[in-house]
Amino acid sequence: MKGGVGLSKRSSAETALLLGALVFYLYIAWSVPYSTTDDLQWGMDQGLRWWLQGSLNSRYVGNFFAVAMCHSPLVKTLVMGLTMFAIPLLMARLAARGEERSLLPIYLASSAGLLLMPPVMWQETYAWVSGFGNYVVPTLLFLVWLLLVRRIVDRGGHRLL
């Protein structure tokens, strides 16, 4: 099934595996503590002022997510967990190129690749709420953009160059 996720055609084992991965990533997100510096500053009124004034840096979208996640543990868990689940899924969608049979193995390999990244990289991105908002969420948005570009090109509606 080209173009769609095809969840209706998945076996119950595949669906259970994907739901298990989602629960796993939500648990990891729930377990990530707030840092005692950046995350607490973003969670205070000062962090909101920084974002509204754009006075800290020019990462407006990332800072928006950092402020939202630092103000609410529920938002943090949902944004981080869903993003952690979605990045390997979108990577798999890009790599599978419409071959639904390949999606699950590629998803598992992509998840393994992300989970096995060096601890130093993990600490600066996935285990730091502000860093996650500034670096990982934009990665998800970039993957969405790539999928949209692929859909346009595959439909033949637009030429890129």
Regions found by a protein language model. Give the residues of each.
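Short, Lys/Arg-rich, polar N-terminal cytosolic tail immediately upstream
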Residues: 1-10
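Transmembrane signal-anchor helices characteristic of membrane glycosylation enzymes that use polyprenol
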Residues: 10-36
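Membrane-interfacial loop-to-transmembrane alpha-helix junctions, especially the N-terminal start
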Residues: 12-15, 98-109, 158-160
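Extracytoplasmic catalytic-loop and juxtamembrane helix elements of membrane-embedded
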Residues: 33-50, 127-132
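Short hydrophobic/aromatic helix or loop-helix immediately within or flanking a transmembrane segment
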Residues: 52-83
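Transmembrane-helix motifs of polytopic, lipid-linked glycan transferases
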Residues: 81-106, 114, 144
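Membrane-interface micro-motifs in multi-pass membrane enzymes
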Residues: 107-150
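Short hydrophobic alpha-helices at membrane interfaces in multi-pass membrane enzymes
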Residues: 151-161
